[in-house]
C-alpha cells in the first residue's frame, strides 16, 4: 500500500520547516546578510546564499531532524555551552593552557556564527509557526490523517480557501 497523504503534510522538523517556509534549494538557503555576520549590509535588505550542511555545521547537524518545538531549547543549551567555553579563558594558568584556548578560538568563533545564524532562522520560522493560520492548517492535516469525519474537514478546507491560504498549503 502506498501512502500518498504523508508527503503532502507540513514537515515539522527544523530542516523541513526551513525548506517549507524559507525555500531551500539543493541545500542552499537565501538569508538576510546580517544573519551571517555581514554587518555592513544590515538593514539594506541584502541577501546571501548559505549552505546548510551538517558535515560542516555541528549545530545544524544536531537540530536538523528534531521537531521544531524543541529547537529553541537546544539552541539555548548550545549558547550556554558556548558561553561556558569562552569563560574557560579565565581558567588558563599556564602558557600551554592559554595556547590550547587560542587554538580552540577558531572553533568557538565558528560556533558563535552558527548559533547566530540558526537563532535568526528560528526567529523567522516562529513568525510563521506562531500564527493562527499555521495551527489551523496543522489541525486539519492531523485530523485528516487520523481519519476524522470528512464533513468537518471539508468545511475546514473551504475555510482555508476562503482565508486565501496558498494552494500548496491546502
Features from the language model and the residues they span:
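Extended, well-folded catalytic/binding cores that form a central cleft or groove in large enzyme
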Residues: 1-170
Amino acid at each position: 500500500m502506498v501512502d500518498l497523504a504523508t508527503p503532502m503534510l507540513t514537515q515539522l522538523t527544523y530542516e523541513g520547516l526551513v525548506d517549507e517556509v524559507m525555500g531551500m534549494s539543493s541545500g542552499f538557503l537565501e538569508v538576510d546578510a546580517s544573519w551571517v555576520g555581514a554587518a555592513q549590509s544590515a538593514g539594506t535588505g541584502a541577501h546571501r546564499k548559505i549552505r546548510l550542511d551538517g558535515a560542516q555545521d555541528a549545530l545544524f547537524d544536531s537540530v536538523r531532524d528534531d521537531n521544531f518545538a524543541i529547537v529553541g531549547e537546544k539552541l539555548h543549551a548550545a549558547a550556554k555551552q558556548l558561553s561556558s567555553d569562552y569563560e574557560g579563558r579565565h581558567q588558563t594558568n599556564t602558557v600551554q593552557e592559554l595556547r590550547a584556548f587560542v587554538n580552540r578560538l577558531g572553533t568557538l568563533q565558528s560556533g558563535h556564527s552558527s548559533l547566530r545564524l540558526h537563532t535568526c532562522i528560528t526567529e523567522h520560522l516562529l513568525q510563521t509557526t506562531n500564527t493562527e493560520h499555521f495551527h489551523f492548517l496543522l489541525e486539519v492535516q492531523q485530523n485528516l490523517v487520523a481519519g476524522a469525519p470528512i464533513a468537518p474537514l471539508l468545511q475546514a478546507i473551504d475555510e482555508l480557501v476562503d482565508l486565501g491560504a496558498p494552494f500548496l498549503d491546502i
